[in-house]
């Protein structure tokens, strides 16, 4: 389970993992108030990518990452619906 030290590396690897098989990929976001740790985990059951942070500024990056993944999911689904109706 590779744990990334920089957000840029993690986000690239996570997006690549999602695009490889969107139906199997899932994202878990966990916050521990006692430690002040925020952990983002992206997995497809074969590969598990982890990024941990204590920085408040990383929350904005994580929010942007989630919206980017949501856009990819919606774009993928809309293409599939269009293909099924034709």
UniProtKB/Swiss-Prot annotation:
Keywords: Acetylation, Cytoplasm, Ribonucleoprotein, RNA-binding, Signal recognition particle. PANTHER family: SIGNAL RECOGNITION PARTICLE 9 KDA PROTEIN (PTHR12834:SF12). Component of the signal recognition particle (SRP) complex, a ribonucleoprotein complex that mediates the cotranslational targeting of secretory and membrane proteins to the endoplasmic reticulum (ER). SRP9 together with SRP14 and the Alu portion of the SRP RNA, constitutes the elongation arrest domain of SRP. The complex of SRP9 and SRP14 is required for SRP RNA binding. Belongs to the SRP9 family. It holds the Pfam family SRP9-21. It comes from Macaca fascicularis (Crab-eating macaque). Heterodimer with SRP14; binds RNA as heterodimer. Component of a signal recognition particle complex that consists of a 7SL RNA molecule of 300 nucleotides and six protein subunits: SRP72, SRP68, SRP54, SRP19, SRP14 and SRP9. InterPro entries: Signal_recog_particle_SRP9/14, SRP9, SRP9-like, SRP9_dom. One of its GO terms (biological process) is SRP-dependent cotranslational protein targeting to membrane. Signal peptide: none annotated. Its main location: cytoplasm. GO terms for molecular function: 7S RNA binding. This is Signal recognition particle 9 kDa protein. One of its GO terms (cellular component) is signal recognition particle, endoplasmic reticulum targeting. It comes from the Eukaryota. It is found in: Cytoplasm. The modification N6-acetyllysine is found at residue 52.
